[in-house]
Amino acid sequence: MNTSQDTIYAQPNEHISDFQFDNRVAGVFSDMIRRSVPGYTQIINTIGDFADRFVMPNTQIYDLGCSLGAATLSIRRQIQGRQCRIIAVDNSESMVARCQENLNAYVSDTDVDLVCGDIRDIDIQNASLVVLNFTLQFLPPEDRETLIAKIYQGLNPGGMLVLSEKIRFDDAPIQTLLEEQHLDFKRANGYSELEISQKRSALENVMKPDTLTTHQQRLTRQGFSHFSLWFQCFNFASMVAIK
């Protein structure tokens, strides 16, 4: 995968546009997410492990908001010979183009349908695994419940949803503490105060995190009977829900 260094916000900008997954971001995304999201590599690797346990032969896997294909590749490595199909979806043409290059670099007997489109429009059926890896937070809050409902309906009994998100906390001191810890993580990974500030401004209107309670209640309302937080580092978390 592309390892170009993320310097998008390294120079002062008079006007900070809303963050978007354009060609600039796609070109540095691997570096950006590694330096911005604590535990990202572990999450990706564990998604593959979950796939090994939960993906059943002749079913479908959905990677909704696949970006450069890290989760799809992790899954595909673990499910050889199961006659499954992965549907990987992203609404950024730049991300999809680079994802296709990454997929082409590895030989596999598992087909991947790479779709450039809105995850809200995807028909989900015969699914044993659905992945939302830092994707739901970018949807308008009013659209999240509908998507979770669609995922639940499309999952086979015993199927799994992996949901990774940046989270917020109603407890103000905890929110401040873990937000500051995350900023220290970014500083330790080489981001300047200017870069941190400008990216925060760019994300302000496009990424709206939920609390863990909100996530769990939404999943329960839509029918998921088993839920667990399996990973958390500061204000980043990954959850599993089983139908």
UniProtKB/Swiss-Prot annotation:
Its function, per the record, reads: Catalyzes the conversion of S-adenosyl-L-methionine (SAM) to carboxy-S-adenosyl-L-methionine (Cx-SAM).
* Any GO MF annotation of the entry: S-adenosyl-L-methionine binding
Q: Coiled-coil intervals in this record?
A: none
Q: Which NCBIfam families match?
A: carboxy-S-adenosyl-L-methionine synthase CmoA, PRK15451.1
Q: Which residues constitute the signal peptide according to the record?
A: none
Tell me the protein's name.
Carboxy-S-adenosyl-L-methionine synthase
Record keyword Transferase present: yes
| Reactions catalysed according to its record | prephenate + S-adenosyl-L-methionine = carboxy-S-adenosyl-L-methionine + 3-phenylpyruvate + H2O
Residues engaged in binding S-adenosyl-L-methionine: Y40, G65, C66, S67, D90, N91, D118, I119, N133, R200
Assembly, per entry:
Homodimer.
InterPro entries membership: CmoA (IPR005271), Methyltransf_25 (IPR041698), SAM-dependent_MTases_sf (IPR029063)
Tell me the disulfide pairings in this chain.
none
